[in-house]
Amino acid sequence: NRLCHLQLVTSGLTDAAMFLPDGEVVQPAEALYKRPIILLRGSFDPVMNLHLDMLKQTRTLFQSSLESQQKQETVELCEISMNNLLREGKSGEIDHLAFLDRANALQALGKTVLVSRCPEFHRIATYLSRYTSSPIGIVLSIGLLNELFKEKWSENLAGGILESFGRLFKHEL
């Protein structure tokens, strides 16, 4: 099932595929509807304690600003973008075994996995905001923070980096 849904994302038939910790494929609308979201982007090759520590610290800080009911409903997503998967494969193809290993490792740790076609931060924020009106938190490492300011992510926008940040923060992020 996971490889079939990965192929849907690869083919451009859907923007994202989501896998619950138990391996079940789920529609993002079902899993995210009106729920606060914490998103960690990365390649997760391999999954490291640093990833888990970043999520733990973010969850603590993020949930301190939520109402008690929302704290219980918070969804933690570990997102692997198609850019990461295609970049790491040979000749622009995805290594399906490596993908399954990463997904299995994250799911064994109780994490929900999201595979998306949204390389730009503002696009993933817009995608997630379709499904929730609750707060969305994106966990950034120093490397990703630096990446956020690169022109390549806003070159297709008339307003450049300023428009990119405007789109990113227009949702409750």
Language-model features: where?
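Nucleotidyltransferase catalytic core that binds NTPs
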Residues: 1-173
